[in-house]
Amino acid sequence: GFTEKFYREVCGARLKPVLESLEHLVATGVWVEVTTLLLEGYNDSDEEVRAMARFLKGLSPDIPWHLTAAHPDYRMLDLRPTRHATLARAHAIAKEEGLRFVYVGNVLDEERSSTYCPDCGRLLVRRRGYRVEALWEAPGVCPGCGQRIPGVWTW
């Protein structure tokens, strides 16, 4: 979620230190990826998703943002599982806001969980569930247009 109320009531924490930590990490050159567990009815409104996307873009449009489906577990057994349509909507909002690397997780969605070149649109890393296939010869470089793809590429 992107409100102090959500962080306090659902996470038992405060939002401000999380945001400050992200700002510090990005400012000092640490590679950062962010995962948000989307809880339907808690932190999945268009306004909240848009606010989160704008904050991340303000740090860098290249920060990968993983929008992850939730399911009933542990202390939230009454939680409704995050619908695929909710993830797809959040993904679209994040892309509209200018984030270049947005992914959905905890669902099977090859298109929205794979990595594409933000310049030419070429598929670079295909993800099918837990299977990952790199489709480039030089990690971090699009073979279609030569665009550098930010990240920590170890294969």
Language-model region placement:
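Conserved AdoMet/S-adenosylmethionine-binding subsite of the radical SAM
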Residues: G1-T82
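Auxiliary Fe-S-binding modules of radical SAM enzymes
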Residues: D46-W155
